[in-house]
């Protein structure tokens, strides 16, 4: 029977049952409640074998922080194909329909967290940001520079956290590429729920707020996985999210967490790769960081995507871009920045460099430079100084960071 790929309609429960099956899980009632509360049904795509859903793809409508601006972005999620229907081209057909719809909607970029990064490079996604997972033994966690707290830290319950955390997050968003807007429903159903199967053996979540002169400017959410032996406690503190509007509040929160008694180790699986913790501890060797892929970014519509972010300096660049899956992006493009305002248009001028659309996805938020990609044999310099010219334009001051999987 022919597989029909089309916009989803109908009862969402079979859709999410297919999502769970594709990821090797079974639908829980609380999982369905969580999905249904934030599901954008009008943006979902399904593959049907008869009446049965065998493939799924969804989208969150986000505003994404990009260098110097925010842009509408499609947050691609719940993408899967049942094991019974793999290797039939279903994913490719869903990606085709989805990217066409994203472009038609006017979203110049799409982002996702990938279960397997190799999959999405076929459809033009590039490695848009990294995350750092850290492990630090508490007995070797002394800070290098003595630090007097600049504010206070207090515990809050989930209801009070829900009133305080969003404003702090939103204050940081425009300053950190990779942050995306969180709707009230996203906070309620994606961040604050604390079911046991989300805890991975740890206890319930704790929430703390940092305030300077009485004004909240940072927060942390963490869990403790208890572990005791004859020598005493050696529990692990897992940092779920730590966000602050200024460096002092960030360090105060880290000092508070590291100072909690009965803890043997502090772990955080998703920090910015330029988080100040690594340079703050006296023994950086004892802070073990494992860097991994985070956001994958697809430049869906090249001209508005490049015109929608800001650049480090004025200048101009001509690029030859290859894009097999979205051919409207392929060709020679001129980027001109004058008085901080970018202009992007097709051109017949000679290019200074050549790249694939996946390379622009890796460069767009500032995770990598053109020179780095050239060293990896991905970007080709076609005119002397082309790489330096490109990096002078696209360079950023902060590493991109996406603190939340979606």
What are these regions (language model features)?
Residues 1-13, 49, 66, 144-406:
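Intrinsically disordered, low-complexity, positively biased terminal segments
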Residues 1-78, 82-84, 89-92:
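Glycine/alanine-rich phosphate-binding loops at beta-alpha junctions
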Residues 76-100, 246-258:
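Conserved acetyl-CoA-binding loop-helix of GNAT-fold acetyltransferases
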Residues 95, 100-114, 261-272:
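Conserved GNAT acetyl-CoA-binding A-motif
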Residues 104-109, 113-133, 252, 273-288:
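Conserved active-site alpha-helix within GNAT-family acetyltransferase domains
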Residues 127-149, 156-157:
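Flexible glycine-/small-residue-enriched beta->alpha junction loops
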């Amino acid at each position: 029977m022919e597989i029909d790929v089309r916009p989803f309609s109908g009862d969402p429960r079979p859709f999410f049952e297919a999502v769970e099956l594709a990821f090797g899980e079974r639908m829980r009632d609380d999982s369905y409640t969580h999905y249904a509360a934030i599901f954008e049904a009008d943006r979902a795509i399904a593959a049907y074998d008869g009446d049965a859903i065998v493939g799924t793809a969804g989208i969150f409508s986000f505003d994404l922080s990009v260098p110097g601006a925010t842009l509408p972005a499609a947050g691609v999620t719940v993408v899967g194909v049942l094991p019974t229907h793999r290797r039939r081209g279903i994913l490719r057909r869903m990606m085709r329909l989805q990217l066409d719809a994203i472009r038609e909607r006017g979203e110049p970029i799409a982002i996702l967290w990938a279960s397997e990064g190799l999959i999405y490079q076929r459809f033009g996604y590039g490695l848009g940001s990294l995350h750092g997972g850290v492990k630090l033994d508490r007995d070797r966690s002394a800070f290098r520079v003595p630090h007097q707290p600049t504010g206070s830290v207090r515990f809050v319950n989930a209801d009070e956290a829900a009133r305080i955390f969003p404003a702090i997050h939103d204050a940081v968003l425009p300053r950190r590429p990779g942050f995306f807007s969180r709707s009230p429903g996203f906070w309620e159903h994606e961040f604050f729920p604390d079911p046991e199967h989300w805890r991975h053996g740890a206890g319930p979540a704790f929430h703390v707020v940092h305030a300077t002169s009485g004004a909240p400017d940072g927060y942390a959410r963490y869990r403790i996985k208890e572990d005791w032996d004859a020598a005493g406690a050696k529990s692990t503190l897992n940092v779920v999210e730590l966000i602050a509007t200024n460096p002092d509040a960030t360090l105060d929160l880290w000092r508070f967490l590291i100072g909690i008694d009965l803890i043997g180790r502090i772990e955080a699986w998703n920090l910015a790769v330029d988080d100040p913790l690594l340079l703050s501890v006296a023994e950086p060797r004892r802070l073990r960081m494992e860097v991994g892929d985070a956001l994958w970014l697809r430049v869906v519509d090249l001209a508005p995507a490049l015109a929608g972010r800001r650049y480090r300096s004025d200048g101009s660049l001509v690029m030859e871009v290859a894009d097999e899956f979205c051919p409207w992006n392929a060709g020679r493009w001129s980027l001109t920045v004058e008085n901080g305002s970018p202009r992007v248009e097709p051109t017949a001028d000679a290019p200074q460099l050549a790249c694939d659309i996946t390379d622009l996805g890796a460069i767009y938020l500032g995770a990598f430079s053109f020179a780095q990609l050239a060293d990896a044999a991905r970007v080709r310099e076609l005119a002397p100084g082309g790489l330096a010219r490109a990096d002078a334009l696209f360079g950023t001051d902060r590493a991109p960071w996406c603190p939340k999987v979606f």
